[in-house]
């Protein structure tokens, strides 16, 4: 790495910055996962408490309208809406996410409220599991970053194998034709 920067200091500075970035990213990821989980729990409370706004047709509450405002302040809100929609679709819940009054609303049939609540419960649990898997992957990346000698060793073995191949070492071990009995 010294050749990239002229001396070892530049390489060490880059490594330091990458470690800081990985740590900051891991902290931001954990914070966002925690916030998402808490907000999903809050939305579940709204569903379970019957506080979703009912929309009546012919005097009968047919649809419920649930504010997604709690989720809107999270990073990658558009992705979160897609995740919610995908989870509801997988549960065969007919729904729509509609914009309105400065916030998005989840529109679903009142009779599907238990399935909607269950979908949000599953998302709440899956958020923690996904955060754990992401932390593991970040740790793996950090380990690979801290162990460049393993990569250098593999590169050296590949160079040796390439040299051996180009020098013809082992070329006489190719497939041979075996003659069968004469007829």
Label every PLM stretch briefly:
Residues 1-91, 98-183:
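Positively charged, small/polar-rich N-terminal and surface patches that mediate targeting and assembly
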């Amino acid at each position: 790495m010294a050749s990239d920067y002229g001396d070892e200091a530049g390489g060490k500075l880059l490594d330091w910055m990458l470690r800081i970035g990985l740590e900051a990213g891991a902290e931001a990821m954990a914070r966002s996962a925690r916030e998402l989980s808490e907000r999903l729990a809050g939305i579940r409370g709204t569903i379970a408490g019957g506080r979703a706004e009912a929309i009546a047709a012919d005097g009968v509450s047919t649809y419920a309208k649930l504010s997604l405002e709690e989720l809107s302040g999270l990073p990658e809100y558009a992705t979160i809406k897609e995740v919610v929609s995908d989870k509801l679709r997988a549960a065969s819940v007919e729904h729509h996410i509609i914009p309105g009054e400065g916030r998005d609303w989840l529109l679903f049939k009142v009779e599907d409220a238990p399935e909607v609540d269950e979908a949000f419960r599953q998302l709440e649990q899956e958020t923690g599991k996904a955060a754990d898997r992401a932390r593991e992957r970040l740790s793996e990346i950090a380990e690979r970053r801290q162990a460049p000698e393993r990569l250098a060793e593999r590169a050296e073995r590949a160079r040796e194998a390439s040299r051996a191949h180009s020098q013809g070492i082992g070329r006489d071990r190719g497939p041979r034709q075996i003659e069968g009995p004469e007829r």
